């Protein structure tokens, strides 16, 4: 009833991470597990697991980070943030996975906010090496009825910077979220 959701486990190489568990009545949603890194050329990194949802007073769990891609492959997408409880914000989206010469994984979408709370921030796009493209930032989560949408995530850095994410929609009485910053070009990104 009052417990937090359990965290999702990490994925096997190239596999999706486990989803975070839902929270009890007043607990926080569990964080999503990280996607598995790929060591095989051409194989995409695993996607991050989704964050667990909260019920009443707790925030949604954060999405897991995407795994790094094998040589020439894209990084895995970040997991989506869990929905926030009635009075709490949505979880942030997970980071996109790193790619050496491919495209960094997209950042995860922020979780929706509860009735009176803002949406979660979108995850940062995955970085890439100098020959790759940074991942797109995640979309901000939608705001609750009386709250603003979450900000979009920043684009990942790389040979070409990734586009910033879109801000989340505001609730009926809330403002929309700000868009994310574009990623830095001609830069070796990190995970």
Question: Which ranges hold each PLM region?
Answer:
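Collagen-like Gly-X-Y triplet repeats in extracellular proteins
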Residues: 1-191
